[in-house]
Regions:
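Short, solvent-exposed loop/beta-turn-alpha elements that line the ligand-binding surface or hinge
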Residues: 25, 79-84, 181-184, 250-258, ...
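Ligand-binding "clamshell"
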Residues: 63-76, 126, 133-134, 167-180
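Conserved C-terminal helix/tail region of periplasmic/extracytoplasmic solute-binding proteins
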Residues: 267-291
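Extracytoplasmic/secreted envelope proteins and their assembly/folding machinery
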Residues: 11, 15, 42, 57-60, ...
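Pocket-lining segment of extracytoplasmic ligand-binding domains
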Residues: 58, 138-139, 144-230
């Protein structure tokens, strides 16, 4: 069974689960294939090359809007519950005139992909602060390039995630706000998904994957030191940063309020053309019982 993933720290529960045999215990022989990004994973899942993939919620809504029948099968990475555990941020230079969300009006913000999760969460957070988002310019840029671009004055704000938040703060950059938390506590940032064809044809494997992932996430949350250590085996994050960065929040099931809000915002912001059928987007077992 092949899973398409990205080389990011949030893969820690998956790697820990494989290392400790949680997937093998469910009868699953897992092969991980690292892709350049979520955009490359979706077509491989649809074609059947990957049984499962890892990607952000907005991208999956956009895929369904293009009649690609992806389905969320499990949760994964969620935003912080409160200010004490933020792992994302809007970073500015140490000497920036921007000191709060209101100051971002009339400035530029770097996001990894236009019309996607970065822009959606930043817009929602700024609007909640009363900012006229039409005055904000969004620029597309990779996470590794953002901090230096801000420090060099090429862009005013970086929509960042760990470990780049910790790396930026070590250079004196200031985190104005966590746009995920500003949109909604426990916002589902990334999930595991499959194709409807695979979900319908092999529900036993889907259920086994959900159980193994749930066990893996529980283990990761209970063993922070192991989570930090295993990140060093599949990323190029320096050990000093891995030891300091804020670890993501994880959940094997999605937060329904989060999925519904992102669907509404994606439609409002023109990121999709049609309303999302949330029930069709979510496979059995991907949400908490009763939701």
């Amino acid at each position: 069974m092949t899973i398409g993933i990205m080389s990011v720290a949030n893969m820690a529960p998956l790697y820990l689960g494989i290392e400790h045999g949680f997937f093998e215990d469910e009868g699953l022989d897992v092969e991980l294939v690292v892709a350049q990004g979520g955009a490359a994973i979706v077509p491989s899942v649809i074609s059947g090359d990957f049984a499962f993939g890892y990607g952000n919620v907005v991208s999956l809504m956009q895929a369904r809007d293009r009649d690609l029948d992806v389905q969320i099968v499990a949760g994964s990475t969620q935003s912080a519950q409160d200010e004490a555990s933020i792992a994302n941020g809007l970073l500015v230079a140490p000497d920036s005139e921007i000191t709060d969300l209101e100051d971002i009006a009339g400035h530029s913000v770097a996001v990894t992909t236009l019309n996607n999760a970065g822009e959606l969460t930043t817009r929602a957070t700024l609007e909640a602060a009363g900012v006229d988002v039409s005055t904000v310019e969004f620029l597309e840029m990779g996470f590794p390039e953002m901090n230096e671009a801000v420090l060099a004055g090429h862009v005013d704000v970086a929509w960042q995630a760990e470990p780049f938040v910790t790396m930026g703060e070590s250079e004196g950059m200031v985190n104005i706000a966590d746009p995920y938390l500003g949109t909604l506590p426990r916002l589902d940032a990334a999930v595991y998904f499959s194709s409807e064809a695979f979900v319908d044809s092999d529900p036993d494997t889907v259920a086994a994957f959900q159980r193994a992932l749930g066990t893996s996430i529980d283990y990761a949350l209970e063993h922070e030191d192991e989570s930090r250590a295993i990140v060093l085996t599949f990323t190029e994050i320096p050990e000093s940063v891995a030891n300091e960065m804020v670890l993501a929040q994880y959940s094997p099931v999605v937060n329904m309020a989060s999925i519904e809000l992102q669907a509404d915002l994606a439609l409002e912001y023109g990121m999709i053309e049609n309303p999302v059928d949330v029930d069709a987007l979510l496979a059995d077992g991907s949400r908490a019982e009763g939701e």
